[in-house]
């Protein structure tokens, strides 16, 4: 019998392996933070909440709505989820006022999370928004591009290009309106390509012949539409390869967002031939544009021609102050502009696509906006023409501001903001250790769903409504889920006139504080121009239910699966 018993060496090896496995399990298994609700079943599994989350992703092609659903499930404004084995849980927060305090005041305790870098770092390794505020990789590029969001630059350079591209888009829709004869057509690509046109034009300059929307207009004017299944299908036209490359790379972020291992997913994607090709096309295009701007600088042109030319002029000035040669071709400049193209076109196009749907389904709001525009721009109305760019930017129309904000509140192009704890701290009275990712959700209770009952004392001092200034109002539970732009208006005492109130209630469409969305000013100006021209020219008619789903899909931003128009020209 003794011959079949394991020897000491085998026993030691087996024992060591068991010890290592047990130690690894203990190291990797979920470790809940005390007092914060969580899924009990997930806490006992090595993969935590990953199986449930991925099941939701496979069904819906969305991820962040699942995070918000946990707060409803546990009836708590703060929950935790176990997404990365061996790592700290994700903390999910839906209380608007605690979120505002974190973003606006507690900037020494919370900063940009590395989570965003995991999503975009593979294709944008030096884009500034993924780095901590104290990091030179954040500060130096930001100093180069800050002036692009100055009101003067937007007014003189960027917004005129938005106006031009939107006018071309309305010509496409005028042609489609005439040919469709009251039947619906998909507007999604029209909106996406017009957004790309305006971003490319303001960033690099874009001639009429290079405009994809102009090409689509020619295609519509010279081809007969095809009627299928009670909708009209129009020709798409040819998509320039650099536009296609931007869309390919933007859509690749979808896969990283929906993956529990985004860094690995991004690496795998970058090995694929079509992604490699898209990266090469994008890099060559930006390099060619840099070459063109450098020639302008060498020829002595110092008046900014476009955003890239302006940034390179700034690089020249900074280099002179630093006593070095300007580096016009550094990777950070390339990444800043590609990030600008990718995020800028996708978020504004998505917001407009959702806005088309909400205004179509809320004809009272649509009519009120049209009346407000014609009242605010009486000369254009009298002369029966489009408002000029100068007329639009010089005229303040409170209801237009309100419509834009209400669309953003409902659309939730970016449904969350994520911050990382820089030190051991508290959130809603719960201990949160250093390194924890805190997801501040903008699509749940307090934003679009009934406010959760929470004693003010449970919040951090800066988040208490009775003690802290600078907090927004609270949305009325009776209509919090309704599309109602009027919620953003208040009457001026004494005159009774209405004014737009950006603090009427909570929203996180652009984040808040020093690390809020860099492109917020341009995005708001863009949406105001687009909605103004669209509603000035067209009545958005009711869409058949089969073409009017409100399902969304997570790409770079959350976009609607269907965006159809039935248009009637407004005299």
Where are these regions (language model features)?
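Cytochrome P450 heme-thiolate monooxygenase catalytic core
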Residues: 114-118, 157-352
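Cytochrome P450 I-helix active-site segment
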Residues: 235-238, 361-413, 433-436, 459-461, ...
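Cytochrome P450 heme-binding "Cys pocket" and the immediately downstream C-terminal segment
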Residues: 363-366, 503-506, 512, 520-558
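Short, small-residue alpha-helix embedded
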Residues: 347-360, 530
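N-terminal membrane-proximal hinge/A-helix region immediately C-terminal to the signal-anchor transmembrane segment
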Residues: 3-127, 136-140, 163-168, 434, ...
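Conserved cytochrome P450 K-helix E-x-x-R motif and the immediately C-terminal K′/meander segment
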Residues: 56-72, 386-428, 449
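Conserved cytochrome P450 K-helix/beta-meander segment immediately N-terminal to the heme-binding cysteine loop
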Residues: 443-497
């Amino acid at each position: 019998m003794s011959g079949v018993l394991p020897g000491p060496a085998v026993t030691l090896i087996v024992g060591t392996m068991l010890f290592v496995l047990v130690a690894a399990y203990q190291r990797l298994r979920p470790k809940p933070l005390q007092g914060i609700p969580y899924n009990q079943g997930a806490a006992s599994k090595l993969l935590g909440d990953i199986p449930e989350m991925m099941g939701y992703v496979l069904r819906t092609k969305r991820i962040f709505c699942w995070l918000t659903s946990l707060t409803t499930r546990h009836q708590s404004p703060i929950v935790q989820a176990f997404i990365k084995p061996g790592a700290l849980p994700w903390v999910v927060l839906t209380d608007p006022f605690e979120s505002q305090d974190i973003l606006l005041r507690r900037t020494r305790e919370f900063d940009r999370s590395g989570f965003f870098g995991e999503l975009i770092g593979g294709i944008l390794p030096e884009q500034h928004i993924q780095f901590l505020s104290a990091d030179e990789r954040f500060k130096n590029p930001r100093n180069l591009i800050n002036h692009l969001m100055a009101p003067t630059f937007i007014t003189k350079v960027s917004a005129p290009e938005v106006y031009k591209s939107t006018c071309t888009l309305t010509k496409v829709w005028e042609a489609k309106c005439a040919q469709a004869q009251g039947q619906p057509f998909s507007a999604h690509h029209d909106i996406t390509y017009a957004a790309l046109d305006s971003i490319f034009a303001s960033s690099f300059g874009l001639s009429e012949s290079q405009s994809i929307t102009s090409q689509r207009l020619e295609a519509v004017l010279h081809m007969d539409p095809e009627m299928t299944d009670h909708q009209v299908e129009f020709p798409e036209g040819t998509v320039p390869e650099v536009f296609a490359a931007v869309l390919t790379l933007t859509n690749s972020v979808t896969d990283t967002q929906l993956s529990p291992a985004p860094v690995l997913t991004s690496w795998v994607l970058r090995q694929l031939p079509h992604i490699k090709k898209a990266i090469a096309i994008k890099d060559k295009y930006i390099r060619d544009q840099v070459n063109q701007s450098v020639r302008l600088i060498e020829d002595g042109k110092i008046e900014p021609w476009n955003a890239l030319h302006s940034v390179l002029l700034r690089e020249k000035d900074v280099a002179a102050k630093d006593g070095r040669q300007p580096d016009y071709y550094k990777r950070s400049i390339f990444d800043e502009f590609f990030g600008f193209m990718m995020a800028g076109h996708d978020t504004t196009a998505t917001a407009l696509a959702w806005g088309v749907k909400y205004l179509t389904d809320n004809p009272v709001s649509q009519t009120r906006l049209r009346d407000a525009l014609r009242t605010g721009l009486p000369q254009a109305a009298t002369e029966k023409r489009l408002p000029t760019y100068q007329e639009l930017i010089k005229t303040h129309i409170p209801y237009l501001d309100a419509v834009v904000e209400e669309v953003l509140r409902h659309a939730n192009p970016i449904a969350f903001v994520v911050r990382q704890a820089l030190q051991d701290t508290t959130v809603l009275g719960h201990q949160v250790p250093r390194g924890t990712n805190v997801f501040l959700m903008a699509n749940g209770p307090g934003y679009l769903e009934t406010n959760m009952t929470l004693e003010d004392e449970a919040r951090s001092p800066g988040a208490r409504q009775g003690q802290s200034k600078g907090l927004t109002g609270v949305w009325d539970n009776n209509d919090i889920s309704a599309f109602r732009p009027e919620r953003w208006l208040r009457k001026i005492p004494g005159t009774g006139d209405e004014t737009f109130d950006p603090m009427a209630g909570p929203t996180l469409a652009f984040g808040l504080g020093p690390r809020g969305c860099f492109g917020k000013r341009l995005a708001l100006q863009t949406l105001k121009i687009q909605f103004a021209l669209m509603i000035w020219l067209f009545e958005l008619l009711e869409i058949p239910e089969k073409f009017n789903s409100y399902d969304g899909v997570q790409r770079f931003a959350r976009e609607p699966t269907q965006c159809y128009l039935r248009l009637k020209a407004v005299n």
